[in-house]
């Protein structure tokens, strides 16, 4: 990531918008900002390609090219309190009902000499 700051010689709002739209369509551009005649472009970009495209629209000069400045991390003034871990949630599952056994009443003769009709 790098920041490219360019000085643009723009006289009207239309030229300013055209310059912004030209830079926005380049690959690798993350953000574009125009303030007081300065164009700030952030992203993985080639500064030479930006100037080459903008020279067709208006007079362009380099002001600076450099890496993105990361915001300073503030150190916490208060000491960190130890985080209390919430108790583990225990789920009580109801065991399934035991299977129901069906009694099969088979038919059989107790009299071995019974008559069988065929």
From Swiss-Prot:
Cysteine methyl ester modified-residue sites: 115
HMA domain sequence ranges: 1-65
Source organism of this protein record: Arabidopsis thaliana
Protein name listed in UniProt: Heavy metal-associated isoprenylated plant protein 12
Role summary: Probable heavy-metal-binding protein.
Lipid attachment points (S-farnesyl cysteine): 115
Gene Ontology MF, one: metal ion binding
Skewed-composition ranges (Basic and acidic residues): 69-86
Record keywords, A-Z: Lipoprotein, Metal-binding, Methylation, Prenylation
Lineage: Eukaryota, Viridiplantae, Streptophyta, Embryophyta, Tracheophyta
Region annotation Disordered: where it falls in the sequence: 68-87
Family matches, as Gene3D superfamilies: 3.30.70.100
Similarity remark: Belongs to the HIPP family.
Listed InterPro entries: HIPP, HMA_dom
Record-linked PROSITE patterns: HMA_2 (PS50846)
Propeptide feature ranges: 116-118
